[in-house]
Design a protein with these regions (language model features):
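Flexible, acidic/Gly-rich N-terminal and inter-domain linker regions that tether
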Residues: 4-7, 17, 27-118
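Polybasic, lysine-rich low-complexity intrinsically disordered segments
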Residues: 20-21
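A structural signal for short, well-ordered beta-strand segments and their strand-loop junctions
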Residues: 45, 68-70, 121, 133, ...
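Short, flexible loop/turn elements at secondary-structure junctions
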Residues: 48-50, 124-126, 174-176
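Conserved Radical SAM active-site core
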Residues: 95-97, 101-113, 137-193
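Local cysteine-cluster metal-coordination motifs and their immediate loop/turn environment
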Residues: 123-140
Length: 193
């Protein structure tokens, strides 16, 4: 991002900055996103070990214009120090990763379990495409980017294993909004099958 050409150095969307082009004044803020921000998921980070996973391939086909960046581990991007989640959310990147352990977590006692004794949740996604003012996710993660674990088959396999010994009440969309990404992931359909 370059500072506003009026010399103030102010890039605030609400500052009312204006610039002159060929003697005509035009709204600088009108084009700010084209100057400063990429579009959502213009960059997709992919862990090397899941680059050829069928779901990874499927998701990448939905974003043909995205720049693909291979990484070793999602935490190298998602958990970096000094991130600005608010700005990142303006040009949110998608991080495709593999969850390798801890597929299910016991629900916290302060959460609604609806009378179920075996209350668990899982995180097939972390963060959200929305920016709701009331949502706790805004302050939960160090990053404004979204992580999607592509190996949902491992979650379902672990669930089948657990269900052989006990019933479970599982919250499948605890750390994200799965329905918002259903067109990309198909996860809600897979969970309900």
């Amino acid at each position: 991002c370059k500072p506003c050409p009026d010399g103030t150095g102010n890039m605030n969307r609400q500052a009312g900055c204006r610039q002159k082009t060929n003697g005509k004044e035009r709204g600088f803020l009108k084009n700010l996103e084209h100057v400063c921000y990429n579009t959502r998921f213009s960059h997709i980070y992919v862990e090397r070990r899941i680059r050829n996973h069928p779901r990874t391939e499927q998701i990448l086909l939905r974003f043909p214009q995205a720049q693909i960046v291979e990484i070793e581990h999602y935490k190298d991007v998602f958990n970096r120090h000094g991130q600005d989640g608010v700005r990142q959310h303006q040009a949110q990147a998608l991080i495709l990763a593999e969850k390798t352990d801890h597929f299910f977590y016991e629900g916290a006692p302060v959460c609604q379990d609806f009378g179920n004794t075996n209350f668990y949740y899982c995180s097939t996604m972390m963060n959200c495409i929305y920016d709701c003012s009331y949502c706790y996710l805004k302050g939960m993660y160090p990053s404004g980017h979204m992580v999607l674990f592509v190996n949902i088959e491992d979650y379902l396999e672990e669930l089948d294993h657990i269900l052989k010994t006990q019933n479970m009440y599982v919250c499948i969309s605890y750390d994200a909004d799965l329905l918002a990404m259903e067109a990309v992931t198909g996860y809600v359909r897979l969970w309900s099958a």
